[in-house]
């Protein structure tokens, strides 16, 4: 059994006991989170969401992804710009699919 949830502007296919990485959610590690924007579960397709359906998970970790380097250079001048970015993420383990 699987479900398709919508979180942080993305759609994710999830199953029970699966670990997913989503954009940062303001909760502490060990807390329970419930996703209510369910697009598909048990063969039911939502319009746009399935009613009375939810996916529950436990937050395992809050962290930062690896650094990416953004480098911009204008070849007609000596202008250069180098920036780094580390995206915040939340690691969630799916514990229950209801619906």
Swiss-Prot record:
GO terms for molecular function: rRNA binding; structural constituent of ribosome. GO terms for biological process: translation. The keyword Ribosomal protein applies. GO terms for cellular component: cytoplasm; ribonucleoprotein complex; ribosome. Keywords: Ribonucleoprotein, Ribosomal protein, RNA-binding, rRNA-binding. InterPro entries: bL21-like, bL21-like_sf, Ribosomal_bL21. Belongs to the bacterial ribosomal protein bL21 family. Part of the 50S ribosomal subunit. Contacts protein L20. This protein binds to 23S rRNA in the presence of protein L20. This is Large ribosomal subunit protein bL21.
């Amino acid at each position: 059994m699987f479900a398709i949830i919508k979180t942080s502007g993305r759609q994710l296919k999830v199953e029970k006991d699966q670990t997913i990485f989503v954009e940062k959610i303001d909760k502490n590690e060990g807390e329970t989170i419930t996703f209510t924007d369910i697009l598909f579960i048990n063969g039911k397709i939502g319009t746009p969401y399935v009613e009375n359906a939810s996916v529950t998970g436990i937050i395992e970790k809050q962290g930062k992804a690896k650094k990416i380097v953004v480098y911009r250079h204008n070849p007609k001048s000596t202008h250069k710009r180098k920036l780094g970015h580390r995206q915040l993420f939340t690691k969630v383990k799916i514990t229950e699919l209801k619906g």
